[in-house]
Amino acid sequence: MSLGRLCRLLMPALLCGALAAPGLAGTMCASRDDWRCAGSMHEFSAKVLDGHTVNLDKYRGFVCIVTNVASQUGKTEVNYTQLVDLHARYAECGLRFLAFPCNQFGKQEPGSNEEIKEFAAGYNVKFDMFSKICVNGDDAHPLWKWMKIQPKGKGILGNAIKWNFTKFLFDKNGCVVKRYGPMEEPLVLEKDLPHYF
């Protein structure tokens, strides 16, 4: 095989992170159009509630739980209460939470980012809250599209997010290690956490 042909074959892998240095691939491969080639959550970015864009590489070396949230869901009280409790007990161990408000399920997150921030403050939320996004469909945030196709991020009866408070557990390398359905309360995750610290 010629060197030119070898380069043409390897270039897509290099650009999509399979062989690239950590962090470099994220700037090239986690956009709205080419999210499939990301190697970890660290290659994505998202806007926090105040509108600033955050590179998710900041979570490198931390165990993370990513969830979609809503303020007017029947599961809101138990999920927010337990997420805050887990964060208080495990943040010092290296656990981080990324909460993404979403209005796709029963229109149960209708508020503005400022209203969502005020609502979360009522639960004394100290973990990271991101701007409202879509988690399903063509307009879904690239991170959420990517999570759902990971080997351990796939759902039951299809990969679509079924409801509010679907949770994904990530290891320190930014890889999905488990998906939890919306009926599984956050404390269910606690038994799995020690495997990843």
Swiss-Prot record:
Gene Ontology MF, one: phospholipid-hydroperoxide glutathione peroxidase activity
InterPro entries referenced in this protein's UniProt entry, alphabetically: Glutathione_peroxidase, GPX_AS, GPX_CS, Thioredoxin-like_sf
Residue numbers annotated as active site: U73
GO biological process, one term: lipoxygenase pathway
Family label: Belongs to the glutathione peroxidase family.
Subunit structure: Monomer. Has a tendency to form higher mass oligomers. Interacts with FUNDC1; this interaction promotes GPX4 recruitment into mitochondria through TOM/TIM complex where it is degraded by mitophagy.
Physiological role: Essential antioxidant peroxidase that directly reduces phospholipid hydroperoxide even if they are incorporated in membranes and lipoproteins. Can also reduce fatty acid hydroperoxide, cholesterol hydroperoxide and thymine hydroperoxide. Plays a key role in protecting cells from oxidative damage by preventing membrane lipid peroxidation. Required to prevent cells from ferroptosis, a non-apoptotic cell death resulting from an iron-dependent accumulation of lipid reactive oxygen species.
Protein name: Phospholipid hydroperoxide glutathione peroxidase
UniProt cross-references to CDD domains, sorted A to Z: GSH_Peroxidase
Entry annotated with the keyword Glycosyltransferase: no
Listed EC numbers: 1.11.1.12, 1.11.1.9
Alphabetically ordered keywords of this record: Cytoplasm, Developmental protein, Lipid metabolism, Mitochondrion, Oxidoreductase, Peroxidase, Phosphoprotein, Selenocysteine, Transit peptide
Record's GO cellular component terms: cytosol; mitochondrion; nucleus
Modification Phosphoserine occurs at: S40
Domain of life: Eukaryota
Pfam families reported in the protein's UniProt record: GSHPx
Reactions catalysed: a hydroperoxy polyunsaturated fatty acid + 2 glutathione = a hydroxy polyunsaturated fatty acid + glutathione disulfide + H2O; 2 glutathione + H2O2 = glutathione disulfide + 2 H2O; tert-butyl hydroperoxide + 2 glutathione = tert-butanol + glutathione disulfide + H2O; cumene hydroperoxide + 2 glutathione = 2-phenylpropan-2-ol + glutathione disulfide + H2O
Class in the EC hierarchy, top level: oxidoreductase
